[in-house]
């Protein structure tokens, strides 16, 4: 507020989406036309059974669809796919786009899979056809990896959650995904950008080496 002259601290009922009118009023007061809602709940694994994953994601997506309906298209949102059931994940994305979603959310690691895994191709194909972004939020859906990196380094979320975005971006750029699904826009959220130069430097080195250059 000191630098912008605007107070972005919203009342609880607006922040927690308990009162949509209050949220819209706060947006008006701060000069914000549109917001994109992204959850914190899903930065970690929410279920280890497909049917539970579907139930949690479907409930969340229906809630956000109702919020969007009340907002006159001002509260867009990120759909959460139940990635343990890829058929259901595609169905959820299709529903979400029809009800105000502008992106599909993913974690840098999904269980025992990384994002270039062909398992996710049906979801990427749907995002490519629907024209929505893939929003990779800091997170980790592999409990073992999260415990190993977080607990082993003093409990820090930096290696366990944030650095995973750098690894995901690096892997995606080296994969066939950008060429296979050219309409997808990728976003890496809440991971800052200090890792970008390191990723770009390493990619340049690898690409030069693959072409036989020093």
Region annotations inferred by a language model:
Residues 1-214:
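Helix-coil boundary/capping segments in enzymes
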């Amino acid at each position: 507020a000191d630098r912008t002259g605007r107070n972005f601290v919203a009342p609880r009922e607006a922040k927690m989406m308990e009162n949509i009118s209050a949220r819209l009023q706060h947006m008006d007061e701060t000069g914000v036309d549109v917001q994109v809602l992204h959850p914190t709940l899903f930065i970690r694994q929410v279920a280890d059974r497909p049917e539970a994953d579907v139930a949690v994601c479907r409930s969340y997506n229906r809630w956000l669809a109702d919020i969007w309906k009340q907002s006159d298209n001002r509260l867009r949102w990120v759909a959460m796919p139940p990635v343990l059931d890829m058929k259901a994940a595609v169905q959820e994305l299709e529903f979400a786009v029809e009800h105000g979603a502008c992106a599909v959310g993913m974690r840098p690691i999904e269980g025992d899979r990384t994002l270039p895994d062909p398992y996710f191709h049906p979801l990427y194909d749907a995002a490519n056809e629907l024209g929505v972004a893939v929003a990779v939020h800091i997170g980790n859906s592999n409990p073992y990896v999260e415990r190993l990196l977080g607990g082993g380094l003093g409990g820090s979320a930096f290696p366990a959650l944030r650095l995973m975005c750098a690894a995901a971006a690096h892997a995606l750029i080296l994969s066939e995904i950008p060429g296979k699904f050219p309409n997808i826009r990728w976003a890496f959220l809440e991971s800052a950008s200090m890792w970008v130069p390191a990723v770009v430097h390493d990619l340049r080195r690898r690409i030069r080496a693959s072409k036989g250059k020093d």
